[in-house]
Amino acid sequence: MLGPLVAVGSRFGIVGILVVVGLYFGGQFLFSGGGAGTSVGLSDQREQAGAARSPDDAASFVGFVLDDAQNTWRKKFAQMGKQYQPAKLVLFTDRTSTGCGFGSAAMGPFYCPADERVFIDLGFFDELSRRFGAPGDFAQAYVIAHEIGHHVQHTLGLDRAKRAAGASSEGPTGASVRLELQADCFAGIWAHSSEQRQLLEAGDIDEALAAAAAVGDDRLQRQGGGAVNPESWTHGSAEQRARWFRKGFSSGDFAACDTASGPL
């Protein structure tokens, strides 16, 4: 998931039981995919991503970014001699059932490894802009690419450490933070690919960096009125999240996203 649940509680108001469900089933909350390809360009999708966009336009934008990110990873996997199996996208309102248990809009976008699907309530993007101060279509694109990053981790078996650690995966250097920062880095790799194809506009990367920082554990804990407690972190600090996204964007290299060991 893109952002941490504040103090193992509720970064978006999610009740404690949902945190437990997420830890038990391995769901990646807060920010997943695949559908038919589209010939519509990103510039066309941007026109639909404005404040007055309809639900259909918003769904079209999410689907486009999801497919484009998955096409990027399909090529990356081929370079590694592997086959990429795309995730599926589920758009829902308020609540839904998943292979990882009950899903709620309060959890934000999330990826469920049990059914290899990304779940998004489109209302989250309004919250991302208004509550978290991260507006813009590329802020939204970062969220989607982050969730696909979790699917990449699951496909490659990189999420096994968190499943093995269970609740003990929390903390500033825990398995949960390492996986989330890697997903941020993977989102940066997709952004790098977009830049190489001349799809980015001025300010896009700034929007993504702002979104990454907005959902840092420390910033969310302060926003919730509590003290910053690194031992309860599940996603990393605002600085870490932005830095790892930038690392993926700057390099475009899978190897640059190794968060399994070493300093974060």
Regions found by a protein language model. Give the residues of each.
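A metal-dependent hydrolase signature that marks the N-terminal structural subdomain at the beginning
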Residues: 28, 32-101
